[in-house]
Structure formats: structure tokens, C-alpha cells
């Protein structure tokens, strides 16, 4: 039986990992060690560990890495602390493999700690491109440390091979977000109203704004102000706003959004974290999705919901026909919002086709984890790039 350690640090990542965690926990040939860290353990991010506890999943360890009193701590210091904390954990609890999702700086730090102890890494969602975020180079660094890859679409899978990853280690399984949308039971609109305390029977938009973190990123406060100005200028929709993430500048974005909601109680409401079920239920009912979260470009095509993607944070990702991209300036955002709310664009959005539909994505990941030979040395591949298809069945 293989011992698989799965790390979760944020609400969004846990929502994606949840079916994988559940299937690893239920598998006869895999043993789950679930480690909760990062924003899950912070009050300012909503103590989202409570969602994991409510799901009844066994938590092997809770490892704090953020300074609760210092939301503006330099990322480099958090990375250093995370490496130290997880090096200690891996020294005492060495798994057969560590399963990581995505590209955040704390996940990069966990990968560094695992690689330094020669613990094999399996990586979900490598090969993507996000030119507007520092996640871009964290993601590709994790790729080079990983022994096994689960990209979410054919384009990302091919990119991994071009980066030197051997095709036999690259399994194009589709997107976990797409699987969640198709399989997770949703709340009714009435249940959403009762759960959030807001009148969501009226047309509403989901708004999530994170700071851009690339070297060329603008001032997060100015970007948040631009979004607020655009929302104020566009009538006829209720703005359901969620909190920002743990990136540098995230606290500023959250404060700006909270202030906007407080100043416009009839037109906007703020919830730090909707959680997976409420978020997907809201996305199913929403008139549009607004902001610069990856879910706005990765998950909304499955619903065919109109989306306004602001700024450069998601630059480089596949942009489907339901997504309008605009600059992070109030006039551009306002124009995009108005266009996204037209019947003409709504019809275009509803016809979108997701490139991330892989069927039983979480099941594929679990089957590969159980069968993959993690003892095999990693090589650098210089050969041709095979054709990938997320809907294709998996075989080792």
C-alpha cells in the first residue's frame, strides 16, 4: 500500500482536490495523509479548515506557515518558513509520494522541501501559463521537481513534454474543476439566498479580485479601486463579492471590496469565502463572473456563463468564447461588464466548450497513483511530442 501525502493550503485548491482526497481515502491500495496548511488556518481567510472538517476527512497534520499578525510579510520569508516546517514534517512522516496541486508560492515551498528529501512529487495542473502572476515560475519549478504529472488539458500536457518531461509520466486527465461542476450537487437559488443572507433572486454577479504578482504588476489598491468604480457605474446587478487570496496585496484588495459592499448594502454583499458548494451553486445561477481568478477562465466554460477577466493575471491561459478580457482600468472594466450582460453575448457564452472535460478526472489520478513506479529515476526527454486528449482512457 502506498502512503500518499496530499497538501492543501487554500479554499480554492481544496475545492479542486476534494474528490481526489475522498477517493484516495477510500482506495484499498492507497493510504491518505492529509496535511492542512496556509490560508486554511488563518482567521483572516475565513478559517476554511472548517470546510474540510465538515466533510469528515481525516486530517493528519495542521501546519501553520503564515504570520497571522503580519499579513504583509514578504513572500520570501513565508517560503523559507514553509520549507523549514515541511522539512521537519517530512523527516518524521516520509510518504511514498506527495500530491500537490497548482502553483502557489507555499506549494512551491512544500515541493522544495519534498525534493530536498528525495520524496517523489505528483503534480496536478502543471504546464499551464499565467503570465500575469508569479505563479508562472513557481508552477514550472514544481514541474521540474515532479516525477508524475496530471495536466488538465492537451495544450498543457504537450507543453510539459516540451519542457523535458517524459511522455510516460504525463497523464492528461482533464480538470478537477470541470469534474466538480458536473458531479457536485448544487444548492437551489432559494437555498443560496438563505445561506448567504443576500437576495440572489435578482440578477447577480460573482466578483473575485486577486492582486497581480508579476514583476510588472500594478498597484493592487488602484486595480481594486478601478473595479469598484466600474461596479458602481453599472446598474441592474447585485455584486456578490468574495475575499482575495494570500498573495502580497491580497489584504488590500479584500479591504477595498469590503468597503465597497459596506457602502452599497442594497447593491453588493461581501463573503470572505463561499466554500466549494456555495461557489459552484452561485456560478450556476449567476448572470456573470467578474475578476481575475483562475476559476473565471478555467471553470466558467463548463457552465457557459459570461465572464469578465480583468488585467493580466490569467494571461497565457486558454480563453474560451464565454470570457471577455479587459484592462484593469475603470472605463475598460465598465465597458466589458455592460457587454457581458447583453443577450447577444450571453448566447455566445452559453455555447462555450470546455477544453478541461476529462470525465472521471479524480478517479484517473487515483488509479495512476496506485500503479505508477515512483522508484524509477527521472529523465530529461528530448523526443517528439505525442498527441494528448483528456477524454482518452488512462493506461500505464
Where are these regions (language model features)?
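Short, glycine-rich nucleotide/cofactor-binding loops
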Residues: 5-15, 101-105, 210-221, 288
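Active-site and donor-binding regions of nucleotide-sugar-utilizing enzymes
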Residues: 7-8, 14-25, 65-167
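A nucleotide-sugar donor-handling region in carbohydrate enzymes
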Residues: 8, 41-43, 145-222, 377
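Conserved nucleotide-sugar phosphate-binding/catalytic loop shared by glycosyltransferases and other
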Residues: 30-78, 85
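Donor-nucleotide binding loops and adjacent catalytic segments primarily
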Residues: 52, 186-285
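A donor-sugar binding/catalytic signature common to diverse glycosyltransferases
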Residues: 100-101, 108, 149, 275-321
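C-terminal amphipathic helix plus adjacent low-complexity
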Residues: 342-396
Amino acid at each position: 500500500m502506498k502512503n500518499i501525502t496530499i497538501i492543501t493550503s487554500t479554499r480554492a485548491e481544496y475545492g479542486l482536490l476534494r474528490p481526489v482526497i475522498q477517493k484516495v481515502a477510500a482506495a484499498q491500495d492507497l493510504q491518505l495523509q492529509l496535511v492542512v496548511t496556509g490560508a486554511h488556518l488563518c482567521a483572516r481567510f475565513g478559517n476554511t479548515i472548517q470546510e474540510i472538517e465538515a466533510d469528515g476527512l481525516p486530517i493528519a497534520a495542521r501546519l501553520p506557515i503564515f504570520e497571522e499578525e503580519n499579513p504583509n510579510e514578504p513572500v520570501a520569508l513565508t517560503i523559507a518558513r514553509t520549507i523549514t516546517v515541511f522539512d521537519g514534517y517530512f523527516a518524521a512522516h516520509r510518504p511514498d509520494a506527495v500530491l500537490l496541486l497548482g502553483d502557489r508560492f507555499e506549494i512551491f515551498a512544500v515541493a522544495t522541501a519534498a525534493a530536498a528529501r528525495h520524496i517523489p512529487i505528483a503534480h496536478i495542473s502543471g504546464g499551464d501559463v499565467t503570465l500575469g502572476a508569479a505563479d508562472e515560475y513557481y508552477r514550472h519549478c514544481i514541474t521540474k521537481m515532479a516525477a508524475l504529472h496530471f495536466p488538465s488539458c492537451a495544450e498543457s500536457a504537450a507543453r510539459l513534454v516540451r519542457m523535458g518531461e517524459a511522455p510516460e509520466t504525463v497523464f492528461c486527465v482533464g480538470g478537477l474543476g470541470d469534474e466538480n461542476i458536473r458531479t457536485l450537487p448544487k444548492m437551489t437559488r432559494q437555498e443560496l439566498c438563505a445561506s448567504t443572507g443576500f437576495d440572489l433572486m435578482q440578477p447577480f454577479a460573482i466578483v473575485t479580485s486577486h492582486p497581480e504578482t508579476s514583476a510588472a504588476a500594478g498597484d493592487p489598491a488602484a486595480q481594486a479601486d478601478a473595479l469598484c468604480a466600474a461596479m458602481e457605474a453599472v446598474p441592474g446587478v447585485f455584486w456578490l463579492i468574495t475575499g482575495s487570496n494570500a498573495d502580497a496585496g491580497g489584504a488590500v484588495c479584500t479591504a477595498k471590496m469590503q468597503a465597497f459592499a459596506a457602502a452599497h448594502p442594497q447593491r453588493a454583499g461581501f463573503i470572505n469565502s463561499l466554500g466549494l458548494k456555495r461557489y459552484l451553486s452561485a456560478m450556476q445561477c449567476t448572470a456573470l463572473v467578474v475578476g481575475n481568478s483562475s476559476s473565471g477562465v478555467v471553470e466558467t466554460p463548463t457552465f457557459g456563463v459570461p465572464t469578465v477577466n480583468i488585467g493580466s493575471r490569467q494571461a497565457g491561459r486558454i480563453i474560451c468564447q464565454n470570457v471577455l478580457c479587459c484592462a484593469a482600468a475603470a472605463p475598460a472594466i465598465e465597458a466589458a461588464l455592460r457587454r457581458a450582460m447583453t443577450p447577444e453575448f450571453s448566447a455566445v457564452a452559453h455555447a462555450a466548450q470546455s477544453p478541461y472535460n476529462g470525465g472521471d478526472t479524480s478517479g484517473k489520478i487515483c488509479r495512476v497513483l496506485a500503479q505508477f513506479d515512483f522508484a524509477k529515476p527521472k529523465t530529461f526527454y528530448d523526443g517528439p511530442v505525442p498527441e494528448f486528449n483528456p477524454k482518452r482512457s488512462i493506461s500505464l
